[in-house]
Design a protein with these regions (language model features):
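Blade/loop signatures of beta-propeller domains
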Residues: 23-55
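Beta-strand-rich domains and repeat architectures in extracellular enzymes and scaffolds
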Residues: 51-85
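Blade-loop segments of beta-propeller domains
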Residues: 57-62, 95-122, 129, 151
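Short coil/turn segments at the loop-to-beta-strand junctions that recur within blades
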Residues: 60, 101-108, 149-156, 212-216, ...
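Structural signature of eukaryotic scaffold interfaces centered on beta-propeller domains
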Residues: 68-71, 116-120, 158-164, 223-240, ...
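Asp-box/WD-like beta-propeller blade repeats and closely related beta-sheet repeat scaffolds
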Residues: 130-193, 208-216
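Beta-propeller blade signature
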Residues: 188-203, 251, 306-315
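Loop-centered beta-sheet repeat module
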Residues: 195-257
């Protein structure tokens, strides 16, 4: 039996709050009704995932860092030090493996690594910086090539390794264009979500997806009237079948697979444009027989960081 539940992650298990049989639209597509109350269901993390605890060994001063994990592969954990700009590689046992720092202004360097992806098979380290440029190095810092991005695009955080030959990303520059159009009272049509799949070797565009969206701003409007783009939206999530595309402006999650039609997976109701305070869908993760989603709320000019975030879960088998 399929079901939808709200869930709150806590320690190593989930509290599912509210659970009712899954509602289906007339076309059979599953949806979440955020106005409804669902019963509670508890799920332990160990029931849906293999849990491993790793302590990254920083006894060597060269591997001390202040930052976050950027990439996890079959055998490696990649961390970026936010102070020095160094990129550090640890084994899955937490032991230091290699490191490099190519921070600088030169043609073979990065200003600061905003996003790092690691392809362990080819030993390619993709480093995105503020210039919207992607440099490619080995895990020891040997320079390989620059990967041209489609003109005018800016992947930043919304980028994943799609397969052995390609990267998949959302052009976050569209959010800046929307703010500029609003500020200049422009009538430019910028209400769409652009996604690209590009070659890891030369940056060639292999596929382009353009999702239409509701013309509504999801970020914050300050007291001075300035628009601030929304933070924390996870628009691309890897899945076993391809990638899940979360498009909150249209309340829908799509499944993208290579050489196959785009498939809607689930949507939220009521629509983002009709809710007050505004609620929008964020993130969608497949894990085992379950699918997890978040719903954020914007009350007035404040983002829902200060408001309870609702977590939903459904059994989709």
């Amino acid at each position: 039996m399929k079901s939808i539940v709200e869930w709150f992650p806590m320690m190593i298990f989930f509290f599912a709050i509210s659970c009712l049989p899954e509602k289906q639209a007339k076309n059979g597509l599953a949806y979440i009704d955020v106005t409804k109350k669902y019963p509670e269901k508890e799920i332990f993390l160990t029931d849906i995932a293999e849990v491993t605890y790793v302590c990254l060994n920083s006894d060597d001063d060269d591997y001390l860092y202040k930052g976050r994990i950027h990439s996890i592969t079959e055998n490696m954990i990649v961390v970026c030090d936010e102070v020095s700009g160094s990129i550090l590689f640890f084994t899955k046992e937490g032991n230091p493996k290699s490191r490099f720092n190519r921070k600088g202004q030169g043609p073979d360097e990065y200003i600061f690594p905003l996003r790092v992806l690691f392809d362990e098979t080819t030993d390619d380290v993709f480093v995105m910086d503020q210039r919207g440029r992607t440099q490619v190095y080995s895990s020891t810092g040997m320079y390989k090539r620059v990967l041209p991005m489609p003109q005018g695009t800016m992947p930043l955080n919304a980028i994943v390794s799609f397969d052995e030959a390609s990267l998949f990303f959302y052009d976050e520059n569209i959010l800046i264009k929307r703010i500029a159009a609003d500020y200049n009272r422009s009538a430019d049509s910028i209400w769409f979500s652009p996604f690209y799949r590009i070659s890891k070797q030369d940056g060639a565009v292999l596929d382009y997806i353009e999702l239409q969206v509701t013309p509504i701003f999801l970020g914050i409007t300050t007291q001075d009237g300035f628009r601030v783009p929304p933070r924390g939206i996870t628009r691309i999530v890897k899945s076993k079948e391809g990638v899940l595309l979360c498009n909150p402006e249209s309340d829908t999650v799509f499944l993208y697979r290579k050489n196959q039609p785009l498939l809607p997976v689930i949507y939220k109701t009521p629509s983002v444009a009709s809710t007050d305070p505004m609620t929008y869908l964020n993130n969608c993760v497949d894990e085992g027989i379950y699918q997890f989603m978040e719903v954020y709320t914007v009350a007035g000019n404040e983002l829902s960081i200060r408001l309870p975030v609702k977590y939903y879960m459904r059994n989709h088998y």
